[in-house]
């Protein structure tokens, strides 16, 4: 599903109206119809006890006035509280105000010194419709509007927001001083970026997307470039298995991972890769740890690496790397590998950046090694998939975690484009970015997945999908969605508390099967 910025939505509206001949009143009518339908579907019983439309003077208010008229026609008791003078309304809003008044609909103008009047109207209603501001808000909400939003939130009545909760920055998802806490938001045309990511998700409530007739030619011209992943689009990416296939058809992965005290990261990544359908997996790790891996990973081959007295891996020669990479078709570097004092891990990563000619993933300590020499990334022979959590992302860009979380989409897109890599910025609503600047937002996953080892599992999943022939973009989309999808299945069955990384691994076969079944 496409996701847009406020500027992109304005341009889509403009092109649809001016170039492709759809009257603005027609778009407004369609918007109002969709909102009214959503209200009656979700809040039918409550609406019959009284609806108050709180409207501004612009086209968002106009949408609300269409809703008022349509509800009035269906004999739903409905009033309008107008946070403006009637003569100041936009032309389209004014037209729809007249339509409501022709049905003898009650309209109350609320002035800055008459906010108590709004309070009285709120107590007489059981459902509120927020039609104050649209997507264009950038400055803090003040005065009458801030007072109105505060009163609406404090009323205890469910609120339906028109397009975007008033007071919410539709792109960043942050409240502009104060914002409507909606129980449901009806996004018009397409959801806005701030509605599908945090913190905006905490204000939107249930998100309903309404088709209002934006011309497809306008969409092609604007090319929004951001999408919310959906199950129906992901299911087609699940690899299928031919009846006469063999293990060689599903990839041979090389996983370079593990160090003293961090063997679990390597184990989780290898197990996740196998459970995600990889045909063969070889783990390359410091030789002193080989007995641990040989015992715990019975389906995985091991390649003991030379190490120094500190049990850190020693750099391999070019010839040794060529032998190790022979007949492999995807690589994972980093889970639990540490940051070697002697520079061996950094040097190994730089060799891979210069020479590796297969799809690959850099995760965990691999990213910490990368942060020590980020300039090498732009010259990678094969663009890797990077999988940072916000702390690792902060180290990569030299900022703090708060700065990363304040603009996850912007930072992910800028980094992927500048460094010509694929990026998975993990967290609630994981952000996927491509070297071309495309963005994908993942809706799956839950707070139970905030536990150790989840990133190692995701890295193993991604590498397995690369090994089975998916390109980097498709592997990221399927892998990230699948990871959270299984987490949601586990949480639904046994709760979020106590959910561990191994639960995701154990759920991979059934999760893949469930996703694949959605194709039919």
Predicted regions: what is each one?
Residues 1-83, 90, 195-364, 368-385, ...:
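Small-residue (G/A/S/T)-rich helix-start motifs and N-terminal tracts that mark the onset
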Residues 68-154, 291, 296-307, 319-327:
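N-terminal small/polar loop signature for handling phosphorylated ligands or for N-terminal nucleophile
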Residues 110-114, 156-158, 341-343, 358:
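Generic structural signal for short, solvent-exposed loop/turn connectors between secondary structure elements
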Residues 125-127, 132-134, 138-224:
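Internal gly/pro-rich beta-alpha loop/helix module
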């Amino acid at each position: 599903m496409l996701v847009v910025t406020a500027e992109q939505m304005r341009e889509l509206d403009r092109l649809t109206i001016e170039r492709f001949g759809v009257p603005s009143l027609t778009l407004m009518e369609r918007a109002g119809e969709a909102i009214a339908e959503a209200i009656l579907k979700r809040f039918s019983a409550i609406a019959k006890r009284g609806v108050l439309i709180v409207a501004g003077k612009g086209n968002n208010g106009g949408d609300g006035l269409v809703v008022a008229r349509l509800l009035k026609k269906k004999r739903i008791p409905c009033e309008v509280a107008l946070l403006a003078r009637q003569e100041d309304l936009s032309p389209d809003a004014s037209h729809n105000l007249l339509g409501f008044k022709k049905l003898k609909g009650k309209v109350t103008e609320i002035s800055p010194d008459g906010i108590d009047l709004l309070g009285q109207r709120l107590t007489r209603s059981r459902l509120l419709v927020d039609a104050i501001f649209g997507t264009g808000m950038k400055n803090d909400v003040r005065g009458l509007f801030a007072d109105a939003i505060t009163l609406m939130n404090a009323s205890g009545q469910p609120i339906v927001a028109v397009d975007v909760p008033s007071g919410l920055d539709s792109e960043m998802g942050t409240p502009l001083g104060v914002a409507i806490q909606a129980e449901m938001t009806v996004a018009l045309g397409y959801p806005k970026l701030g509605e599908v990511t945090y913190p905006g998700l905490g204000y939107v409530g249930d998100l309903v997307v309404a088709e209002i007739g934006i011309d497809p030619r306008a969409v092609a011209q604007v090319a929004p470039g951001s999408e919310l992943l959906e199950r129906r689009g992901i299911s087609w990416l699940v690899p299928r298995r031919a009846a006469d296939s063999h293990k060689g058809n599903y990839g041979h992965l090389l996983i370079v991972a593990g160090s003293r005290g961090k063997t679990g990261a390597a184990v989780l990544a290898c197990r996740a890769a196998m459970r995600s359908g990889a045909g063969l997996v070889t783990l390359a790790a410091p030789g002193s740890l080989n007995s641990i891996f040989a015992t715990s990973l019975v389906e995985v081959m091991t390649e003991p690496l030379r190490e120094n007295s500190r049990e850190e891996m020693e750099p391999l020669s070019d010839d040794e790397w060529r032998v190790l990479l022979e007949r492999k078709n995807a690589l994972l570097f980093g889970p639990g590998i540490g940051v070697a004092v002697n520079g061996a891990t950094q040097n190994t990563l730089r060799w891979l950046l210069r020479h590796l000619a297969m799809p690959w993933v850099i995760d965990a300590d691999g990213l910490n090694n990368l942060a020590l020499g980020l300039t090498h990334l732009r010259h990678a022979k094969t663009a890797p998939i990077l999988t940072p959590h916000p702390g690792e992302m902060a180290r990569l860009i030299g900022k703090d975690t708060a700065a990363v979380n304040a603009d996850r989409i912007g930072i992910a897109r800028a980094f992927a484009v500048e460094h010509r890599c694929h990026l998975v910025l993990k967290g609630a609503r994981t952000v996927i970015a491509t070297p071309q600047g495309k963005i994908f937002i993942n809706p799956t996953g839950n707070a139970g997945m905030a536990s150790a080892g989840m990133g190692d599992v995701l890295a193993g999943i991604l590498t397995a999908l690369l090994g089975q022939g998916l390109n980097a973009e498709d592997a990221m989309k399927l892998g990230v969605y699948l990871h959270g999808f299984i987490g949601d299945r586990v949480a639904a069955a046994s709760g979020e508390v106590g959910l561990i990384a191994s639960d995701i691994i154990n759920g991979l076969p059934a999760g893949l099967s469930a996703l694949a079944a959605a194709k039919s």
